[in-house]
């Protein structure tokens, strides 16, 4: 009987210089000549454990999965004081380097340098992770076979003001300062379409058990540092135009999933705008907006349908 673990843990020094990054690679059921690996980039103020069930679903569909806790998140923090912190400077750039290293670490555990196995990578970024993933796909050396963006956003006219304000806070309070004003600017309207909200995070999903688990988890829902907000808004600014879409290789197909009750996605308008930028620049894009869905499509009450749609899309673009 096969007793192998379903994932291997890897660690490496973060390019942000904030400490060690911890990640996992979930092994595919079979090692074919081509291994297709889904690299997941999680969202703001959460961690990779929240994706365990989805990762195992993808494995059952025949894929390998790579995921890591980003700097300032989950097991990649040295202490609670480091939560929501990508470093005092250049975090918006160095976090992308960690994406590269995480995939390289996963590849080492999926293949032997002497064999002929080939790894094709798909990216899946959620929320903040979708901004990072969108920016990563525009890199000239990204080498991504396809991308999935969940809970993403269109252009936000307040981004420039937010970056300016974060810079002022950093100057006078320090990069690690946690500003209630910055938090309020980023999230104050998230519950406006939920009149019966029980908690500050009901906008995430209609699944109450998942909301309650998120609220009870000290590694979720914390206030970002001022530098963390600056980096978050910088990512969004860099991907909020057709110019970004023009930098994404046209041969990279894209799937966008979102809920029409997601405030981060402007209630469906943001993902639709992102899809339009991609379509106008010649990309093959599929946009799925789920009725009644809130921010976390992967954790919604209709998540089995969402997971199935993602797997079907991956199979359509598979080389296997």
Task: Go through each PLM region and give its residues.
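Conserved alpha/beta-hydrolase
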Residues: 50-81
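Alpha/beta-hydrolase-fold enzymes
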Residues: 133-219
């Amino acid at each position: 009987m096969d007793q192998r673990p379903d994932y291997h843990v890897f660690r490496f020094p973060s390019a942000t210089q904030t400490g060690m990054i911890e990640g996992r690679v979930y092994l595919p059921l079979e090692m074919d000549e081509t291994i297709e690996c889904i690299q997941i980039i999680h969202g703001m103020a959460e961690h990779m454990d929240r994706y365990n069930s989805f990762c195992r679903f993808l494995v059952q569909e025949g894929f390998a999965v790579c995921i890591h806790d980003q700097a300032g998140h989950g097991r990649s923090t040295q202490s609670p004081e480091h939560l929501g912190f990508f470093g005092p400077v250049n975090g918006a750039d160095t976090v992308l380097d960690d994406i590269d290293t995480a995939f390289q670490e996963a590849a080492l555990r999926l293949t032997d340098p002497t064999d002929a196995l080939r790894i094709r990578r798909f990216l899946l970024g959620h929320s903040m992770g979708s901004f990072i993933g969108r920016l990563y796909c525009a890199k000239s050396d990204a080498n991504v076979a396809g991308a999935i963006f969940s809970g993403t956003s269109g252009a936000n006219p307040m981004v420039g003001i937010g970056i300016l304000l974060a810079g002022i806070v950093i100057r006078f309070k320090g990069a690690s300062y946690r500003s209630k004003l910055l938090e309020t600017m980023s999230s104050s309207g998230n519950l406006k379409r939920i009149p019966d909200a029980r908690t500050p995070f009901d906008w995430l999903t209609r699944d109450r058990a998942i909301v309650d688990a998120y609220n009870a988890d000290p590694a979720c829902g914390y206030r970002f540092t001022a530098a963390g907000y600056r980096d978050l808004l910088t990512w969004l600014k860099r991907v909020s135009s057709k110019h970004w879409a023009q930098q994404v290789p046209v041969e990279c197909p894209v799937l966008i999933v979102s809920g029409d009750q997601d405030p981060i996605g402007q209630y469906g308008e943001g993902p639709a705008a992102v899809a339009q930028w991609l379509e106008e620049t010649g990309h093959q894009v599929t946009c799925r907006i789920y009725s009644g869905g809130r921010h976390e499509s992967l954790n919604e009450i209709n998540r089995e349908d969402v997971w199935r749609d993602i797997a079907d899309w991956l199979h359509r673009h598979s080389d296997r």
